[in-house]
Amino acid sequence: DRYYTRRQAELLDKQIDDPNIITTFAMRYGNPSIKKMLTHLQKAGCESIVVLPLYPQYCAATTATVCDEVFRVLMKMRWQPQVQIVPRYYDHPVYIKAMVNSLERDLERLEFEPKQIVLSYHGVPKKYLQKGDPYHCQCHVTTRLIREQWPYKDIPIETTFQSRFGPQEWLQPYTDETLEGLGKQDIDSIMMACPGSVSYTHLRAHETAM
């Protein structure tokens, strides 16, 4: 994640092209940490900060922890800049269009014609949904909007959830079980994508490939 997140920040900085705006990144669980980056911005004299969580769909386990950590760090600093948090953008037209365009480019690079597209989102325990977390619903809305703009209507698109562990029930359908089921239906050419994170993840790609 770190490599791609850094590259995104670098490319965004080039696009903004404003010497008065610092475009950088921080990791929730890694380096540079949110604390380290906020300290850097303080020393740089920043008075206004825009925080962009790289999770299109809101979840208490992801987006909320980023926001919590930002304000937890600021509470202990004698520096209170104006802070704006970019809200969830799971249904934003620009995001949806970018996902569709990305899928089309990937489809053109394939050496086979897929019979099915599986959109695999990072899973969370089902109890999150039962407590009112909107993540599950927002993932399905993202898939629906992608499906509506997808030009190849003969290739169906399905939502699944991956990365579960432990004995408790997680969001379903599970990615691995879905792939097994498709194989039993003789659907042997499948295209997969993970639209639940703006930053590409090797771990998730490897996991789903397994």
Residue ranges and their predicted role:
Residues 16-19, 74-80, 111, 149-154:
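Short helix-capping segments at alpha-helix termini
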Residues 84-93, 144, 151, 162:
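Short, flexible loop segments at boundaries between secondary-structure elements
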Residues 93-113:
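Hydrophobic alpha-helical segments within soluble ligand-binding/sensing domains
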Residues 46, 112-114, 187-188:
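Short, high-confidence coil segments that cap the C-terminus of an alpha-helix
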Residues 24-98:
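Long, hydrophobic, well-ordered secondary-structure blocks that form the structural core
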Residues 201-208:
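Conserved small/polar residues in nucleotide/adenosyl-binding loops
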Residues 1-22:
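N-terminal glycine-rich anion-binding loop in soluble enzyme alpha/beta folds
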Residues 126-153, 165-173, 178:
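Redox- and metal-dependent alpha/beta enzyme cores, enriched for Fe-S-associated oxidoreductases
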